[in-house]
Structure formats: C-alpha cells, structure tokens
Design a protein with these regions (language model features):
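Extracellular/periplasmic helix-loop-helix junction of adjacent transmembrane segments
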Residues: 30-58
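Interfacial helix-cap and linker-helix signal at transmembrane-aqueous boundaries
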Residues: 34-35, 66-67, 151-157
Length: 157
C-alpha cells in the first residue's frame, strides 16, 4: 500500500471510529441549554447520555456478527444511515423523551464505525501492521475528546 493510500485509510478509519465519541463530547456543553429548552430536570437531561452509552455498548455486540455475515459495507452503511437519521431527529425532537430515544438510536448507528473500522484493519493488515494501524486510528480518535467540546460550545454560540 502506498504512503498516501495508507494515510487515507488511516484517516477514514480513524474518522469512523471517532463518530460516536464526538457525539458524546460535542454534546456535553449543551446539556444545561437542553434542560432549559425542554423544561427538564438535570437528571432527565442526563438520561440522554445514559441512553447513548447503553446503546453504544449493546449495539457493538450486534455489528460484529452482522459484519462477519453480511460483509463490512452493508452494516456500515446501515449504521451510518441510522446515525444520520437519528441525528436529524435529535435536532427536531419536540420533547426530552423523544430526544432520549433518538440518542439511543444515534448511538446504535454510530457504533458501527467503531466495530467495522477495527474489523477492516484486521482484514487488511498483518499483526505488526495492524497494531501500528490501531495506534494511528487511536491517535485520530483521541483528538475527539479534545476538539468535540470546543466544537459543541461553538455551535451553541
């Protein structure tokens, strides 16, 4: 694989892996605003995070077997479409309870990138190269907790 192709693969897989973490950290600065806008208590607003984490954990258990059975592309597209549709539904949620449900679906779709990106690395690279790719992907994903709250705060302004 050429150096430019390797860089492209690293950035794409890193971005797929960073989707769900970005959706957590970008969202945090807006929690107080959500409470005010939906006239909801802090505990109820925090359920949006709980729903996200539960779906993120449980859905990863499904994408692995689906990706093994149906290939990498179809489950990834299903997950990304679910993520985008749920994200739009989150933006249009009329109440906090709809938002909680949509955050659950958003995480269910967003975790496809986490699982399938790792599977693709195992498909494309041998053990030593795979370890290097995993570390590079984590470098890209590691920027999410740094950049996402800044972006989320900027979106609120």
């Amino acid at each position: 694989m050429t150096r430019s192709a390797l860089l492209s693969v690293t950035l794409i897989l890193g971005a797929l892996t960073a989707i769900a973490p970005m959706s957590i950290d970008m969202y945090l600065p807006g929690l107080p605003t959500l409470g005010r806008e939906f006239h909801a208590e802090a505990g109820t607003v925090e359920l949006t995070l709980t729903a996200f984490f539960v779906a993120l954990a449980l859905s990863q258990l499904l994408y692995g077997p689906f990706a093994d059975r149906f290939g990498r592309t179809a489950p990834l597209y299903v997950g990304l479409i679910l993520y985008v549709v749920a994200s739009v539904a989150c933006a249009l949620a009329p109440d906090i309870y709809t938002l909680i449900g949509m955050r659950f679906l958003q995480a269910s779709g967003g975790c496809a990138g986490i699982v399938i990106a790792r599977a693709v690395v195992r498909d494309l690279f041998e053990s030593r190269e795979a370890a290097r790719m995993f570390s590079l992907m984590m470098l890209v994903m590691g920027s999410a907790p740094i950049l996402a709250p800044i972006a989320g705060g900027y979106l609120l302004v």
